[in-house]
């Protein structure tokens, strides 16, 4: 059926800020969909609240709104734009839930807006547990024994009937939010109570546990003519019980017999036909390893994380095809853009193995609960392609950037037998390393299979890796064995370790023996048809399919997996860098390992190499392509860390030179540069051991800010107030970066602001200054940022501009740099300089309309600001106010403290823009899902040093009409100052929560919590109590404030929205 001509304007809803369970894959899907619809001649209107995305660039849709995805704002936009249709299946759960709300409130009907793609009734059938159960029963597809509970008591009755263990799945939530596996009634009570609160329809599915079954996924497509295909099937390394987003996944499936494959394929197609899905859909199934019994786990009736992985694994662009199906086109009339010959009806065939491994945030959250279950915890993922399981798995392991280059980890090597067994049985993020170590220790794989329920086929592959290791140890420099090791994914570093030589020596011997990788094309058809996709992976075979062109080439290094501190913002900068290179007529080559992002869409760059971002893997591509040089500025710390080794190997680093990157990153060199430039910084020193750190802190004076050098996202950074805490830190956290010293700085609690600057070597452009709402001490990535600044005097602004110019020129910056300042007692100090693109680039690019990454790339390639029409200095400020707000994923991370400090904790960001600060703040809070009720109770439990400041806020809350609740000390202080306060009991370290503030939060008697810990390391009881209070507020979805500056901001909003009532 040809595309529809009765609709002209289509609105797409994006997925909002990045949280665990809903990450960059939706930027990739949304970008693809917008471009596909524009390609077919439709006018596209986009609504998304996340500025850090390519999707929200002006050129992706015809009209872009960066506004909160709430009923209030989306309705307003619908009324203003009057689109003919709405496409909701590309914005993750956020987009789907919004469409449901718009439909149920009658707005779509009122405005005569049609929903495209999968019908709402089908979405309801797939998402509503009861309706889905009825559907599966009607088509004879087996589900787990289950029932729906709307109360805790109902859940207990159902569990008693089915028998423990039980799986709890809240309805209409994403990434397994609020769910879990329960072995006891006590666990069930706790998980169901939380799950009911998080489910928008107050429903939980209580189902039998099939933990231990194989988990298989099918990515399927269907059109309105009922044509349906399987794009890709995938198999989880971990059995059922671990969320698929956290599991290691292989594509295509590896252990299924042909009968099993066909049986599950038929079931997936049966379901998609019955649901009448139009577009992409993900079906998850569980297969009993000992019989042909299977269960349908769930269906995602939309583009998902798995579809992004399937798209990159096969080269088949699922989101693009889904968008075309939504406008009435059928699979047999859409051309496959990979081959440009076959149609979209043609099922992809793979002649390689793809491995995906999740990237977890536990390097930042050492106290986080690492146990993996049905609730997702990964922030990102990596993908690797190889000709066998061993190769793809080991390439994926070294793509993770967790300090390992092989499937071995120091902690696992040092573990005793008891710990090995415990870590194998427990499903944790690092289980692969302990299972591998157990095999090295000689534990039979049959025993491991029995303990872990991991298929013996996968364990046999790990055993094969161990056998190659053992052969390498005793056959040093043997060329045939070296070739075998490389074919199975071994890195030069691992071989060097086994041979006790340097990686350079291994590389030299490889090249001498002509053991070099070839690059194979990802073509969707296992080379059956000729394909022209410039999408490659390395392997050690004969024929090289990546042909070098005659054009001048630039290699751009991506930023690898998404993690806290290095998010989608860096991918945004990478994509814009590529566009600028292409505009200058050069060939842009991207190297990256992240399947979720726009930069790894093969249609973006001239060539894409899906490879780990390690020296060896990058160098192999450079050897083949012989580029003019490499750009490292846009790939975050990942790319910056490769600058030095690449430069030493004779590779030209374009833009700011390696010695100048070093001057910004190395403490002593940076201090000298600041002295030479006459720019003040907070007093500080470096220390290489505990005694040196104590001596330095005593000299500088407490409080001090302490951190390792060369880190991103404030890793292992703390504010320390006394010697005892400092010694504790040095013993606990200093291993964060062993090769580099620890930095000890005077902690100035002033106003913080930051600047992104672009320099051509002579002139410096400052697109804007961002002012942070939270004072120094809260990581810049976790601070709310306001542009243009609202509280800086002209003298301070002039000083910031002057220091920025001096630094950019003094550090020989070519391209981009980011500088963070603190203003303390009217004096401007430089805290740090990052000689690269920072996480604020997308936000500032959007609000100033200056394409910063593209401009910086033009500088790197030799152009200058003046010729491009830009004046040096601070760019003119617009008349709107823009606020960037951090977004956190604490609901997914049990035992992670939400108290904000110098270590970054946010996973994403949202933006609010309006004509006044108050309105922009309101939008940013709404977009970040920090919604304050118009009235209710606010609970204060604050540190002694914060009580004076809290008094003014308490008065303001009372004035608006809020009731005040506080713990004893805070309550007494507020009462003394004439306020009416209801006093609640502290926990005092006890287990009994009855009558305490925690019970108040749990029972919904409190609408907001203000909890500060002050600057001294609190006593264990106070610290534990504070942690439990914060956890309770987060799990109940109650706004929590751990910084008084954020409280001041939200009060500004509430005051601007409330009327004053005074008697005459």
UniProtKB/Swiss-Prot annotation:
Pfam families: CPSase_L_D2, CPSase_L_D3, MGS. Mn(2+) 1 binds at residues 284, 298. Its EC number is 6.3.4.16, 6.3.5.5. It catalyses: hydrogencarbonate + L-glutamine + 2 ATP + H2O = carbamoyl phosphate + L-glutamate + 2 ADP + phosphate + 2 H(+). It is an enzyme of class 6 (ligase). Binds 4 Mg(2+) or Mn(2+) ions per subunit. It comes from the Bacteria. SMART domains: CPSase_L_D3, GARS_A, MGS. Residues 133-327, 671-861 form the ATP-grasp domain. Residues 930-1064 are annotated as: Allosteric domain. Keywords: Amino-acid biosynthesis, Arginine biosynthesis, ATP-binding, Ligase, Magnesium, Manganese, Metal-binding, Nucleotide-binding, Pyrimidine biosynthesis, Repeat. ATP 1 binds at residues 129, 169, 175-176, 208, 210, 215, 241-243, 284, 298. Mg(2+) 1 binds at residues 284, 298. Mn(2+) 4 binds at residues 832, 834. GO terms for cellular component: cytoplasm. ATP 2 binds at residues 707, 746, 748, 752, 777-780, 820, 832. Mn(2+) 3 binds at residues 820, 832. Mg(2+) 2 binds at residues 298, 300. The keyword Secreted does not apply. Pathway: Amino-acid biosynthesis; L-arginine biosynthesis; carbamoyl phosphate from bicarbonate: step 1/1; Pyrimidine metabolism; UMP biosynthesis via de novo pathway; (S)-dihydroorotate from bicarbonate: step 1/3. Residues 402-546 are annotated as: Oligomerization domain. Composed of two chains; the small (or glutamine) chain promotes the hydrolysis of glutamine to ammonia, which is used by the large (or ammonia) chain to synthesize carbamoyl phosphate. Tetramer of heterodimers (alpha,beta)4. Large subunit of the glutamine-dependent carbamoyl phosphate synthetase (CPSase). CPSase catalyzes the formation of carbamoyl phosphate from the ammonia moiety of glutamine, carbonate, and phosphate donated by ATP, constituting the first step of 2 biosynthetic pathways, one leading to arginine and/or urea and the other to pyrimidine nucleotides. PANTHER family: CARBAMOYL-PHOSPHATE SYNTHASE [AMMONIA], MITOCHONDRIAL, CARBAMOYLTRANSFERASE FAMILY MEMBER. This is Carbamoyl phosphate synthase large chain. The gene is carB.
């Amino acid at each position: 059926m040809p595309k529809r001509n009765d609709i002209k304007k289509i609105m797409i809803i994006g997925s909002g800020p990045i949280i665990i369970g809903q990450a960059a894959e939706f930027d990739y899907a949304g970008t693809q969909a917008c471009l596909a619809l524009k390609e077919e001649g439709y006018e596209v209107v986009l609504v998304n609240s996340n500025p850090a995305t390519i999707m929200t660039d002006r050129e992706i849709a015809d009209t872009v709104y960066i506004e909160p995805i709430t009923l209030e704002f989306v309705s307003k936009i619908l009324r203003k734009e009057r689109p003919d249709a709405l496409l909701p299946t590309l914005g993750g759960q956020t987009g789907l839930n919004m469409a449901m709300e718009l439909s149920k409130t009658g707005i779509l009907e009122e405005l005569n807006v049609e929903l495209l793609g999968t019908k709402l009734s089908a979405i309801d059938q797939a998402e509503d547990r009861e309706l889905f159960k009825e559907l599966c029963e009607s088509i004879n597809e087996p589900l787990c024994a289950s029932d729906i509970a709307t109360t805790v008591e109902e859940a207990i009755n159902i569990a008693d009937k089915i028998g423990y263990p039980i799986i709890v799945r809240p309805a209409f939530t994403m990434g397994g939010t609020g769910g879990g596996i329960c072995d006891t009634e006590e666990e069930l009570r706790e998980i169901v109570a939380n799950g009911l609160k998080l489910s928008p329809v107050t429903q939980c599915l209580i189902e039998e546990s099939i933990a231990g079954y194989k988990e298989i996924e099918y990515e399927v497509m269907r059109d309105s003519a009922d044509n349906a295909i399987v794009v890709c099937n995938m198999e989880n390394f971990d059995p059922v019980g671990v969320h698929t987003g956290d599991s290691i996944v292989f594509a295509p499936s590896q252990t299924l017999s042909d009968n099993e494959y066909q049986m599950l394929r038929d079931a997936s197609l049966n379901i998609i036909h019955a649901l009448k899905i139009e577009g992409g859909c993900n079906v998850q199934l569980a297969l009993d390893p000992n019989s042909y019994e299977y269960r349908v786990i769930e269906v995602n009736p939309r583009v998902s994380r798995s579809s992004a992985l399937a798209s990159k694994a096969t080269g088949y662009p699922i989101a693009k095809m889904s968008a075309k199906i939504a406008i009435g086109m059928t699979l047999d009339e859409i051309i496959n853009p990979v081959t440009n010959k076959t149609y979209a009806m043609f099922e992809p065939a793979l002649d390689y193995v793809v491995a995906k491994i999740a990237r977890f945030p536990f390097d930042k959250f050492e106290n986080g609960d690492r146990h993996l279950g049905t609730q997702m915890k990964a922030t990102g993922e990596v993908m690797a392609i190889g000709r066998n399981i061993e190769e793809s798995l080991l390439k994926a392991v070294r793509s993770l950037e967790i300090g390992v280059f092989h499937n071995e980890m120091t902690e696992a090597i040092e573990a005793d037998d008891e710990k090995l067994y415990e870590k194998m049985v427990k499903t944790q993020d690092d289980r692969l390393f302990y299972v591998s170590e157990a095999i090295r220790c000689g534990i039979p794989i049959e025993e491991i299979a029995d303990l872990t329920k991991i298929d013996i086929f996968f364990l046999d592959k790990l055993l094969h890796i161990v056998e190659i290791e053992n052969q390498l140890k005793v056959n040093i420099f043997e060329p045939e064995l070296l070739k075998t090791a490389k074919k199975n994914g071994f890195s030069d570093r691992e071989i060097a370790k086994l041979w006790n030589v340097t990686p350079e020596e291994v590389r030299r011997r490889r090249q001498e023996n002509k053991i070099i990788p070839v690059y194979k094309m990802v073509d969707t058809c296992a080379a059956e048809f000729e394909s022209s996709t410039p999408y490659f992976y390395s392997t050690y075979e004969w024929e090289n399919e990546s042909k070098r062109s005659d054009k001048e080439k630039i290699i751009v290094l991506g930023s690898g997996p998404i993690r806290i501190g290095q998010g989608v913002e860096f991918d945004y900068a990478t994509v814009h860098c590529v566009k600028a290179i292409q505009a200058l007529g050069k060939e842009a080559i991207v190297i990256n390992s992240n399947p979720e992002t726009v930069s790894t869409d093969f249609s973006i760059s001239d060539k894409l190499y899906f490879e780990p971002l390690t020296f060896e893997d990058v160098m192999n591509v450079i050897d083949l392509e012989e580029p003019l040089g490499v750009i490292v500025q846009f790939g975050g710390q990942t790319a910056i860390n490769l600058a030095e080794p690449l430069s030493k190997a004779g590779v030209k680093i374009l833009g700011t030179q390696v010695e100048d990157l070093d001057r910004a990153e190395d403490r002593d060199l940076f201090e000298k540069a600041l002295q030479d430039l006459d720019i003040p910084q907070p007093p500080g020193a470096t220390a290489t051991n505990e005694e040196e750190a104590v001596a330095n802190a005593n000299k500088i004076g407490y409080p001090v800010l302490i951190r390792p050098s060369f880190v991103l996202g404030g890793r292992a950074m703390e504010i320390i107030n006394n010697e005892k805490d400092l010694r504790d830190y040095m013993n606990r956290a200093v291993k964060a970066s062993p090769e580099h010293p620890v930095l000890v700085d005077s902690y100035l609690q002033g106003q913080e602001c930051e600047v992104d600057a672009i320099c051509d070597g002579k002139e410096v452009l400052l697109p804007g200054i961002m002012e942070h709402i939270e004072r120094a001490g809260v990581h810049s990535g976790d601070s709310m940022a306001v542009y243009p600044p609202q509280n800086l005097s002209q003298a301070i602004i002039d000083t910031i501009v002057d220091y920025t110019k001096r630094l950019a020129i003094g550090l020989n910056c070519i391209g981009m740099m980011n500088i963070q300042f603190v203003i303390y007692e009217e004096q401007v100090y430089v805290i740090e300089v990052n000689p690269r693109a920072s996480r604020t680039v997308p936000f500032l690019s959007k609000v100033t309309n200056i394409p910063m990454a593209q401009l910086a790339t033009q500088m790197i390639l030799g152009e200058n600001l003046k010729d491009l029409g830009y004046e040096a200095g601070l760019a003119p400020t617009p008349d709107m106010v823009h606020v960037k707000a951090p977004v956190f994923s604490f609901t997914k991370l049990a035992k992670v403290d939400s108290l904000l400090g110098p270590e970054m904790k946010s996973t994403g960001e949202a933006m609010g823009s309006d004509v006044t600060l108050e309105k922009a703040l309101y939008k940013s809070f709404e977009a970040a899902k920090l919604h304050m009720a118009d009235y209710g109770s606010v609970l204060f439990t604050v540190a002694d040093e914060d009580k004076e400041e809290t008094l003014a806020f308490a008065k303001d809350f009372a004035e608006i009409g809020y009731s005040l609740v506080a713990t004893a000390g805070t309550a007494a202080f507020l009462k003394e100052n004439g306020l009416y306060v209801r006093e609640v009991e502290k926990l005092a370290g006890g287990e009994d929560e009855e009558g305490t503030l925690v019970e108040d939060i749990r029972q919904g008697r409190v609408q907001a919590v203000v909890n500060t810990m002050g600057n001294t390391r609190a006593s264990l009881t106070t610290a534990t109590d504070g942690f439990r209070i914060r956890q309770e507020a987060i799990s109940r979805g109650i706004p929590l404030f751990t910084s008084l500056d954020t409280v001041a901001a939200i009060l500004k909003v509430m005051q601007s929205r409330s009327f004053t009532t005074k008697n005459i």
